[in-house]
From Swiss-Prot:
GO terms for cellular component: cytosol. Its main location: cytoplasm. The lineage of its organism: Bacteria, Pseudomonadati, Pseudomonadota, Gammaproteobacteria, Enterobacterales. The keyword Zinc does not apply. The active site is at C99, H392, C422. This is 3-ketoacyl-CoA thiolase. Belongs to the thiolase-like superfamily. Thiolase family. Pfam families: Thiolase_C, Thiolase_N. PROSITE patterns: THIOLASE_1, THIOLASE_2, THIOLASE_3. Heterotetramer of two alpha chains (FadJ) and two beta chains (FadI). It is found in: Cytoplasm.
Length: 436
């Protein structure tokens, strides 16, 4: 094993995760219909600061992400600073790493802390699948630009006369990979076939996710980390995630038809995560700064790793690539972990990554390692359910996972937790967190 790379500042401080908070996650076009991601981000950051009693001027940097960006406000981070009463001098910039966006935001703030340029910062992400940048066709877009340059009315009319009715149709955001044309669900189908994952296995994992998430809410385990959200038209609050199937049976999952490969597929809407609206954020500080303010950190960031693989085949294997690297940098093995939380983009993707982590052959032939990362103990895995149940506002999921894992590790007496995710573009992310 390579030498561990401790995440500490120049003064020897650990990177403390002081607190975290999220909105409830809502299925597309439900409770947050019409609420843009910026407003969701302002909602969660404002509430988190109010709950923590941390003066806004203590926060020196805010790094936030949004995957489905709105052209009228390309820097969501700065808009959150300006819209929550924080100091106008607070540094703020936005990041995007697809489904691992808030992992990246956390890493960026951690690096600023280690460099000594700040002592406290906020990281997070927000996305809305209900407020989308609906565009225009390329033909219409080019015509509008040319018309803006035209000098006479006749020149403009000539340009517009070339348009056809189809050119006037709205264009929704792309759901396929730009480089390959493959949808995420197509890749999930690839992985199900490559790794021999059956429809029954996928449905069972999805059912487990919903059962455990419902149980977590029933037992009050999530109440401290999920705010009550009031969204226009303010008729009723949203207190819990509204995607969780509390009373479903395994037989219910078997009724759905494949969503991507209609003839031979096994990936359905029920064993995939849905389009979701929501926001999540965490406050990070140097350990000494937290002590100065009299704060008990929720936990600490021990290590992180980002990886990238080919996009044409099984590109959602990011966790299988990034996990061994994050463990190595933390000086740990899979057996040392108290909990493991893997983003469930699809049940097929999740099960494929679990197979790869346990495979000596994958370790040798693909990763160039001598042995497998290890077989994941089910009793440690996604113990409160996962993204299939909670939903997946792309940029918010990582911050949700970090906060949720740290709370649960602390409830279990402390230890280490792994949070890991795949992302579009063949990207992967993994972080080791620690709670005492």
């Amino acid at each position: 094993m390579s030498q561990a790379l401790p995440l500490i500042t120049r003064q020897g401080d650990r990177i403390a995760i002081v607190t975290g908070l999220r909105t409830p996650f809502a299925r597309q076009a439900t409770a947050f219909h019409g609420v843009p991601a910026i407003d969701l981000g302002k909602m969660v950051v404002g509430e988190m600061l109010a709950r923590s009693d941390i003066p806004a001027e203590v926060i020196e940097q805010l790094v936030f992400g949004q995957v489905v960006q709105m052209p009228e406000a390309p820097n969501i981070a700065r808009e959150i600073v300006l819209g929550t009463g924080m100091s106008v001098h607070t540094d703020a910039y936005s990041v995007s790493r697809a489904c691992a966006t808030s992992f990246q935001a956390v890493a960026n703030v951690a690096e600023s802390l280690m460099a000594g340029t700040i002592r406290a910062g906020i990281a997070g992400g927000a996305d809305s699948s209900s407020v989308l940048p609906i565009g225009v066709s390329k033909t219409l877009a080019r015509t509008l630009v040319d018309a803006n340059k035209a000098r006479t009315l006749s020149q403009k009319l000539k340009l517009f006369s070339r348009l056809r009715p189809r050119d006037l149709l709205p264009v929704p955001p792309a759901v396929a990979e730009y480089s390959t044309g493959l949808r995420m669900g197509d890749t999930a189908e690839q992985m199900a076939k490559s790794w021999g994952i059956s429809r029954e296995q996928q449905d069972a994992l999805a059912h487990r996710s919903h059962q455990l998430a419902a149980k977590a809410w029933e037992e009050g385990k999530l109440s401290a980390e999920v705010m009550t959200a009031y969204a226009p038209p303010f008729r009723e609050p949203l207190e819990q995630d509204n995607n969780i199937r509390k009373n479903s049976t395994l037989a219910d999952y078997q009724k759905l038809r494949p969503a991507f490969d209609r003839k031979h597929g096994t990936v359905t809407a029920a064993n995939s995560t849905p389009l979701t609206d929501g926001a999540a954020a965490v406050i990070l500080m140097t350990e000494s700064r937290a002590k100065e303010l009299g704060l008990r950190p929720l936990g600490y960031l021990r290590s992180y790793a980002f990886t990238a693989i080919d996009v044409w085949q099984d590109m959602l294997l990011g966790p299988a690539w990034s996990t061994p690297l994050a463990l190595e940098r933390a000086g740990l093995t899979l057996a040392d972990l108290t909990l493991i939380d893997m983003h469930e983009a699809f049940a097929a993707q999740t099960l494929a990554n679990l197979q790869c982590l346990a495979s000596d052959r994958f370790a040798r032939e693909v990763l160039g390692r001598s042995q497998a990362t290890g077989e994941v103990d089910e009793s440690k895995f996604n113990v409160l359910g996962g993204s299939i149940a909670y939903g997946h506002p792309f940029a918010a999921t990582g911050a949700r996972m970090i906060t949720q894992t740290l709370h649960e590790v602390r409830r279990r007496g402390g230890g280490f937790g792994l949070v890991t995710a795949c992302a579009a573009g063949g990207l992967g992310a993994a972080m080791i967190v620690e709670a005492e």
